[in-house]
Structures are given as C-alpha cells and as structure tokens.
Amino acid sequence: MGVQSTANLPKETVSHLDTAPTPKPGVLLQVRAGRIKKGALGGEITSAIYKQQHDGPVFCSATGVLGDEHASSGHGGTERAVHQYNPDHYPDWRAENPPEPDLYDVGAYGENLVTTNMSDENVCIGDIYKLGDDVLLEVSEPRHPCFKLNSRFKWPRALKRTIRTGRAGWNMRVLKTGNICKGDTISLLERPYPKWSVLNVQRVIRARNVSLNLLAECTQLPMTDLFLDIAKERLRSAPKTYTLVDAHLVAQRVRKLTFALKEPLTIVNPAFDPYAFAQVTFGRETKFERSYSIVDGDIYKFSLGVSLDRQSRGGSAYLHNELKIGDQIEMSPGSNPGAMENDAKCDESLTRVLIVGGIGITAFLPSMRDWESKGLPYHLHYAIRSLEEAAFLDQLPKDKTTLYIRSEGQRLDISGAIPKPNHDGAYNARIFSCGPSGMMKECETVAKELGYPDHMLHFEDFGSGGGGDLGEPFEVEVDEPDSNRHETMTVPPNKTLLDVLNDAGFDVLYSCKSGACGACKVELCEGKVDYKSTALLGKEKGKALQACVDRGIGRLRIEID
C-alpha cells in the first residue's frame, strides 16, 4: 500500500545535510531497454521511455544497455548511460490518485535497472557500485525530469509532483563494461560523498532557502554539467553578505565603495557577466533596496560608484553619509541576458558609440576595459556638469573620449554623435547610452529615426528597475486555488514572470530556466503570450506558458498549481 508524499522541496529551508544511509547489497530484478518511437506519447512526442525487460544476459557498454536508445540529445551518452529508479515509489504514486494510476507500474519512468534496497535517499553522487561479476557503475546525477512525464502518465501534474517530491531516480556512468543479468547482485564499493544523496542534491538546488556553504559544496561534486551549472548559477545569484572595506570620493559627489565577501566561499567562476549590476540591500532601521552598476571586481570583491542624488529618497544619502568601513550589505548580481544576446547578433568589429551623462559612466567602465584589452573600437561622448563632478576621468583613454563640460558652455549634440547609415543602408556602429532620462530618450529617438535596429541599441536605465531588456512589461493576474490567493502584479522589462512570481512567494517550480524542460509551466486562463519556450506542445500554446522565458502581451490571467 502506497503513501502520498507530503514533501515539497521548493518550500524547504536546508541548512545542513545528514549522512545518507548505506544501502545493503541488492538484487537486480529487471534489465530494461527500448527503441525510439515516433508519436509514442499522445501521438505527438518522439520518445524511448517505453522499455522492455531482458531476461537473459545483456551487454552494458560505456553508453548503456545494449539495444537502448534515447530520443533526446540530453539523454544517454556516457554521462547518463544507465537510468535507475526505485520501484518502491510506484505504489506511492498510485496513492496520489493520478487520473490513470495503473500507468504507474515498474518501468514507467523509463529506467534501465530495477533493483532492491536502493533509493533516492541512500544512493549518493559519486557512489561506485559493482553489478554482477564485471560491471562498475558511478552515480552521476539525479534524473532531470521533463514535460514528457505529463504525457507518459496522462497527468498534467506529473512533472511538478516528481520535482516537488524528489522521486526522480538517478543516472550513472559505466566505469567498466560487461554482461548483466536479472538476479545479479549490486553492491556499494566506494562512497566519497556520504551526505550528498540523490535526494539531498535536489533539496539543495531547489530549496527556497539554502546554506551558501552547501551550494558551494554542491558545485564541487562529480556531477553532470547540467546539475553543476544549476548549482553554480544558484550560488552566483544568491544574495550574499559583504563588508565595506574601502570608501573614498572620486568626484565631488561620487563615492567609490568597495565591498568584500564576508564568508569564505568557493565559487567556480567568480567573474561577473557582461553588463552585470549589483542588487543591494542596506540600512539599519530602514532597509533600502537599490540597483547600481558594478565599476570593477568580481563576486569576491567589487566596487560601486554612487552619486549623491540631489533628490535622494534616502538610498544614496545613506551610502554617502552613513555607511562606514566594516558595515555590511547584502548583494546579489543582476544580469542582462538580452544585452549579451544582442552582442552575439552584432559584428564585433563595429565601432561602439557611447553617449553618457554624469554617473552613467559607471555602467560601461567594465565594458570599456574589456574592449580596450581586445583592441575593439569605441568612442565615448561624456557629458558632465563640471570637471569637479566628473567621476573616473583617470580611467578614460583621452584619445577615445570627448568631454562636454556644461559649466564651460559645451553641449553634447546627440544627433551629431550618432553615425548615420552608409549609402547602402548598412550601419557601422552600435549605440550605448546611460545617463539622465532626457538624454537617453533623445538618443533613442535619434537612433530610431535613423533606422537603427533594436539589437544595435543598448540603454542602461536603473530608474525602471535596471539592467535588462527581456521584453515589454506586462500585467499578470495570478490565482492560486490551493491557498485562495489572488494577486495582480507587473512584470518589468528586466525580469521574467518566474522571477516576479517567486519574489512574491508563489514558489513556482523551475529547473532549466531556458524554456526547455517544462518545470515552470503555469496555466493560462486569459491573454496573449509571446512564446519563446520549446517545451510546450502545439496544443498547449494558448492554454499554458513557461514562466521562465514566455512573456505576456498586455495583460494575462494565470493559475498556479
């Protein structure tokens, strides 16, 4: 008799991990393999999830069981050669009252191996098992479930329930090949990571709150790139505590603040992405949340240039007048994937024309250093009130900078600074701008009148949330029947629907965050969608969307399971 699971990994707080129990030697009950079938799931999906038993000996090669095929490039290969699933889960699935409980039978998850005594709780990453007389297997990752499970079990909640419960199974590498057969013994030989069970890995990468040290440990496990990248990205993007280690004026009203990470962490790639910005929380009694351009540094140690706003709501005044050496802030790095995508679309040899006003110079200092090191062409048009108020002048190459000093009667002519297209209609420059809203608006107007395509224009505007251009803003009405919660929210240009929903505490599941796995699918009740995801079936479009990449047009109404 099965038991309905109450586990919900995305709502957990994980601060420590217990050592996983050691599995006793088990018996191989089934060996399964299957061929690719077109239209196997609901007549629409090509899959090899339907596998048949092999009663006699079968060869297990470096890429898995002989005769087993994989329809997706993300399945199979040497890193995911063999899939195993705990057969004890099937009665528990039937206890969840899915529409067709009989579909939850041994083999239904597409597993190659069915054994006794092994589970998500007692199998660890890096474990090495001996199967039969010859074969050695190494656990490489939890199974990464996808939208096909919904079709396999004819249950729209199948994928989400698999993620929430952590009953996903695991994949293995074949370290030593050989024949395997029903009745063989499988036993644990080595366990280098005793607390990193398959379930614990999922808990750490999916939990609402998780220790940064655990995330850092997770990035060092011998897992597949898919799960390592998920752990690395979560570690990089998580809010971290920093200490102010240096502060000084670099202009009359600009204070350069340098922060160092408080707790030691191992971060595989500490460099910030291009066009990254800092999302900071600071203050004592009153907490401020602001976004600032990152002047230099990496996740371990970075600097901001903060201008004292004459009309400050308290944020810049606090950072100038109250923040002292040794004080702490929280920072999480923001990214601008739209800008990086535009970089990829443009010829790298194009001249970059920067139109900047005042403190807007901080938005492009890292980019200019990068272009300088690569020998890429650029020219900066920098409008300032006076030399005394101009920040970071010592970092600007004189031969690539034109200053416009208002106190000396000089004015930046934006229409003259933006190059016109060639006689054949080609554009030889990209336009970058950051500064007062009036300057950026004029820059955009001139560029549009000249016919510049959107991917050749880059505007940094933290006044609207800052640092991104994922698409047009839209409104979303959210219903959550389980909690009787109803909210109406705005999704800004620099955030995804997934970001906004989870920031509001809706706990929407996610996995790949690229629109390919189906984990963050939400039901569409009303409205039009700009679809960018690949996981939805044709018949699902208009009825659902992927919160990580799909965007509403105008206003949406959605329902969250």
Swiss-Prot record:
- Molecular function as annotated in GO: 2 iron, 2 sulfur cluster binding; molybdenum ion binding; oxidoreductase activity; pyridoxal phosphate binding
Main EC class the enzyme belongs to? oxidoreductase
Specify the protein name: Reductase FVEG_12641
Under CDD domains, the record lists: fer2, PDR_like
Spell out the residue ranges making up region: Disordered: 1-26
Cofactor or coenzyme needed: FMN
Additional record remark: Fusarium verticillioides possesses 2 unlinked loci, FDB1 and FDB2, necessary for detoxification of antimicrobial compounds produced by maize, including 2-benzoxazolinone (BOA). The FDB2 cluster arose as a duplication of the FDB1 cluster with rearrangement and expansion by incorporating additional genes.
Q: Which family does it belong to?
A: Belongs to the PDR/VanB family.
User: What is the documented function of this protein?
Assistant: Reductase; part of the Fusarium detoxification of benzoxazolinone cluster 2 (FDB2) involved in the degradation of benzoxazolinones produced by the host plant. Maize, wheat, and rye produce the 2 benzoxazinone phytoanticipins 2,4-dihy-droxy-7-methoxy-1,4-benzoxazin-3-one (DIMBOA) and 2,4-dihydroxy-1,4-benzoxazin-3-one (DIBOA) that, due to their inherent instability once released, spontaneously degrade to the more stable corresponding benzoxazolinones, 6-methoxy-2-benzoxazolinone (MBOA) and 2-benzoxazolinone (BOA), respectively.
Quick one: which residues bind FMN?
F288, E289, G305, V306, S307, R313, G314, G315, S316, T362, S514
- PROSITE patterns referenced in this protein's UniProt entry, alphabetically: 2FE2S_FER_1, 2FE2S_FER_2, FAD_FR, MOSC
Q: Which organism is it from?
A: Gibberella moniliformis (strain M3125 / FGSC 7600)
Residues of the MOSC domain: 52-189
The UniProt keywords, alphabetically, are:
2Fe-2S, Flavoprotein, FMN, Iron, Iron-sulfur, Metal-binding, Oxidoreductase
Per UniProt, residues of the FAD-binding FR-type domain are 237-342
Kindly give the Gene3D superfamilies that the UniProt entry links to this protein. Answer: 3.10.20.30, Nucleotide-binding domain of ferredoxin-NADP reductase (FNR) module (3.40.50.80), PK beta-barrel domain-like (2.40.33.20), Translation factors (2.40.30.10)
Q: Where is the signal peptide?
A: none
Where does the record place the 2Fe-2S ferredoxin-type domain? 474-561
